[in-house]
Amino acid sequence: MKKTIMSFVAVAALSTTAFGAHASAKEITVQKGDTLWGISQKNGVNLKDLKEWNKLTSDKIIAGEKLTISSEETTTTGQYTIKAGDTLSKIAQKFGTTVNNLKVWNNLSSDMIYAGSTLSVKGQATAANTATENAQTNAPQAAPKQEAVQKEQPKQEAVQQQPKQETKAEAETSVNTEEKAVQSNTNNQEASKELTVTATAYTANDGGISGVTATGIDLNKNPNAKVIAVDPNVIPLGSKVYVEGYGEATAADTGGAIKGNKIDVFVPSKSDASNWGVKTVSVKVLN
């Protein structure tokens, strides 16, 4: 009887959204210490969308101001904005279609997708969680859950199945050891994106800046942090990256002059920044 009622709710939800967009919006008040990126992650929305909804031209926000958060998932055109953690399998299941259909509709040659991009889904999402639960129960062949928007790799699955075989480098928790492990194994990792950029360097107090990154990292308190400033339209904020000559870092900051294929690497001192100068380097986006 319970399953019958749950199915009826799912069907009713589908019928109300079959010919229109299913959307809702809410308004939040910016709190002291909030960042635009942090708000986007907390509410599960894309940073670029958040700026468009509120007509923002920069990442600067002020405590006390109001921001509109829209949870719109699809439009009448059947477009869906990919979120961090999405996979083609998840999206196909969410919209009642197949991975193959999504690839055909969007001219995809692989399962690789990127957060912030849009996909044609040719339908609407169900409004009832019970419908999703039933679909998962009836579709055991669905692809396994992934933690990031990236192509599934057999080698990674093998590591997950054999946790006792972790290398010493993977078990170390110190920043220096992790950096060495990344440098020695980067060539064996499959990056989700690789590009050539112009790289300059900056310190925590260049040009009178506060020393706090766009994602809330206090560089004055973390002088050895591996952080780079990026154009979020090229490298998403929060991404783990490997920068040639710098090592593994987090794309945690932005800058007015950082546009397109250009990055700024954070270094502890002015002398380090001067020694770095201007370089052309390769950047691998690891997730």
From Swiss-Prot:
Compositionally biased tracts (Polar residues): 182-193
Keyword terms: Cell wall, Repeat, Secreted, Signal
Entry GO CC: extracellular region; outer membrane
Chloroplast listed as a keyword: no
Signal peptide (residue range): 1-25
InterPro entries documented for this protein: 3D_dom, LysM_dom, LysM_dom_sf, Resuscitation_pf_RpfB, RlpA-like_sf
Stretches assigned to the LysM domain: 26-69, 78-121
Gene3D superfamilies: LysM domain (3.10.350.10), RlpA-like domain (2.40.40.10)
Annotated region described as Disordered, given as residue ranges: 130-193
Comp. bias regions, Basic and acidic residues: 165-181
Amino acid composition bias (Low complexity), ranges on this chain: 130-143
Origin: domain of life: Bacteria
Protein name per Swiss-Prot or TrEMBL: Cell wall-binding protein YocH
